[in-house]
């Protein structure tokens, strides 16, 4: 989207009259909560594995640990990823706050246009031509300033989104070692039906 093509009234209104960052902050809190929950799951899973190592001995426990390794890595990566989502949401919120601070206030833009119209209406003898030109230059500056702010906002948001990686499905546990036989969908449904 080329924000530079929009007049300052549009860009400023989109920032000042928009929904604001509340929904993004709520999303960040939700991701943080999920991160805390999954970190607790990760720690519990690791404790369980350590308990099994203490209780068992021999090649079976080593086989179990090897089978669980991919899932442990996935769980660790998931927690990092959840934390990164929250962090990048806050980056997007900061980008919005900077844009909100730097955007030309709507009142300034409207005052410029209103004053210009008054001068045009009373410029029969050309006595206000210079002032009208000054107001037009100020309006052009508003246009450029708002376009630059929106460009920067877009770049900051794009940068934050680029740091988010696709979600990976959890790997199976113990499938390759045949410690736990894979359950087919038909078997799983028949077990739940009985």
Swiss-Prot record:
Changing residue 127 to I: Does not disrupt the interaction with EspG5. It is found in: Secreted; Cell surface. Keywords: Secreted, Virulence. One of its GO terms (cellular component) is cell surface. Forms a heterodimer with PE25. The dimer forms a 1:1:1 heterotrimeric complex with EspG5. PPE41 interacts directly with EspG5. Belongs to the mycobacterial PPE family. The PE25/PPE41 dimer induces both a strong humoral and cellular immune response. The dimer induces necrosis, but not apoptosis, in mouse macrophage cells. It also induces activation and maturation of mouse dendritic cells and drives Th2-biased immune responses. This is PPE family protein PPE41. It comes from Mycobacterium tuberculosis (strain ATCC 25618 / H37Rv). The gene is PPE41.
């Amino acid at each position: 989207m080329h924000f530079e093509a929009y007049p300052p009234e549009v860009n400023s209104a989109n920032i000042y009259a928009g929904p604001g960052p509340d929904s993004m902050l709520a999303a960040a809190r939700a991701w943080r909560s999920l991160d805390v929950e999954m970190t607790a799951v990760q720690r519990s899973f690791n404790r369980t594995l350590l308990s099994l190592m203490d209780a068992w001995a021999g090649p079976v426990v080593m086989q179990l640990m090897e089978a669980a390794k991919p899932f442990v890595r996935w769980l660790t990566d998931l927690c990092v990823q959840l934390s990164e989502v929250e962090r990048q949401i806050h980056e997007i919120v900061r980008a919005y706050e900077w844009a909100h601070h730097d955007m030309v206030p709507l009142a300034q833009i409207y005052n410029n246009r209103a004053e210009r119209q008054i001068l045009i209406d009373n410029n029969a003898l050309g006595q206000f031509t210079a002032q009208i030109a000054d107001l037009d230059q100020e309006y052009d500056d508003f246009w450029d300033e708002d376009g630059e702010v929106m460009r920067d906002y877009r770049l900051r948001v794009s940068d934050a989104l680029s740091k988010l990686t696709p979600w990976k499905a959890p790997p199976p546990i113990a499938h390759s070692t045949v410690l736990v036989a894979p359950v087919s969908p038909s078997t799983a449904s028949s077990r739940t039906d009985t």
